[in-house]
Each structure stands twice: as C-alpha cells, then as structure tokens.
C-alpha cells in the first residue's frame, strides 16, 4: 500500500508538471495570478489586460540574476520597454521556508540598490505562481501579449553563462520577441530552455 501511495504521488506530481508546462506554452493563455508587491499592494495579471507584459523570475542570491543586474542589462531592458508602455513584473518565487527567501522589504532594498525599473516586484512566497507557469530558473522570462496569450517562454538570451560581459554581446530573446510581436509579426523564437539557478520551491 505504501509503495502504491508513493507511485500515485509521483504520477500526480508528473501530471501537474505536464499540465503547468502546457498552460504556459507559447500560444496558450497565461495563467491568472494575484500577488503582493514589495509595498504591500495586491497586483493581478488581469490588471494589465490590453498591454504587453514581461514576467521575469528573479532571485538576488543567484549569480545568473546578478549577471544581468551587474551588467545593467536587466534594468536597461526594463527602461527600454517601459518607454513602449510594456508592463514588467519581476517575481521572486523562492518559498518562504527557504534560506534564500527575501522579505518584501529585502527585495525592495535590493531592487533599489540595482536601479531596477520593473513596474512591480512581486513576492510569491507560496511558490504557487511559479509552479503555475512551470518556471524553472532565475531568470526565466515570459512575454504575454495584450490578449493574455503567451508569446515567448524561456531564457533571456543565448549566452548561458554567469559572466556579466556576455550580456552585452548576447542575442536577447525577450527584446526580439517584443519587437516582432509589437510589429504584428510572428515571434521567430517562441521558446527556449531557460538557464540559471533552480527556483527554490
């Protein structure tokens, strides 16, 4: 009986992962969520219907995240696309019970120190939103169009290293997806494998 229960739990976990992965595939509707930002304000994805939205999974403890902030790459993208009325939501899905968890105040302080320019920094302390999107790494990026459809899911760029210098010469998939989608063109690269640190669920 114990073996059966274990096997059933493995099957359920596998099926949940498969359903979550399907839910955030390019062409699918982006899963709805409501999270709290670092100022304590409730933020829903639905608040931004009619706009392009970028989701950035982040964790200050991750060297791959620090690569993009140390180089100024992430802040530069945030500012670049804010000028085009794109909403940028940075999400920390590190579980509240994990040693790497950051309180809202700690996340706000870190983002301010980096010069972050996201529309909002959101705390997903239960990891529910991260799991709904099957987010696997920090950074893991999603581009959602004004209809709520996922247009891109994956790595931020094609330089899979933690070296800040690489960010300046990389092919940036997020910029490419936004540029093409906002011009009414098909997104040429809709999905890639994200690289970085595992999300601490």
Q: PLM ranges: what are they?
A:
Residues 7-18:
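Bacterial N-terminal signal peptides
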Residues 20-23:
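Boundary at the C-terminal end of the N-terminal hydrophobic targeting segment
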Residues 33-53:
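A short beta-strand-turn-helix
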Residues 46-66, 88, 178:
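Short active-site neighborhood of thiol/selenol oxidoreductases, capturing the structured segment around
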Residues 85-101, 117-127:
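Thiol-based oxidoreductase modules, predominantly thioredoxin-like and allied folds used
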Residues 105-151:
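Short, internal strand/loop/helix patches
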Residues 143-201:
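Thiol-/selenol-based redox modules, centered on thioredoxin-like
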């Amino acid at each position: 009986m114990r073996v059966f229960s274990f096997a059933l739990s493995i099957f359920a976990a596998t099926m949940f992962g498969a359903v979550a992965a399907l839910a955030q595939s390019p062409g699918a509707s982006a899963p709805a969520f409501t999270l709290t930002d670092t100022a304590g304000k409730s933020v829903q994805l639905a608040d931004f219907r009619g706009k392009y939205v970028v989701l950035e999974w982040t964790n200050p403890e991750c060297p791959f995240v620090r690569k993009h902030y140390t180089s100024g790459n992430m802040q530069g993208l945030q500012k670049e696309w804010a000028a085009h009325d794109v909403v940028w939501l940075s999400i920390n899905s590190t579980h509240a019970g994990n040693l790497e968890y950051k309180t809202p105040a700690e996340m706000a302080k870190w983002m301010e120190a980096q010069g972050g320019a996201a529309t909002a920094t959101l705390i997903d302390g239960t990891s529910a939103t991260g799991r709904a999107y099957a987010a696997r790494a920090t950074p893991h990026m999603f581009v959602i169009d004004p209809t709520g459809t996922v247009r891109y899911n994956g790595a931020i760029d094609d330089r899979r290293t933690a070296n800040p210098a690489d960010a300046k010469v990389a092919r940036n998939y997020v910029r490419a997806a936004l540029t093409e989608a906002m011009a009414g063109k098909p997104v040429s690269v809709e999905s890639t494998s994200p690289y970085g640190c595992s999300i601490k669920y």
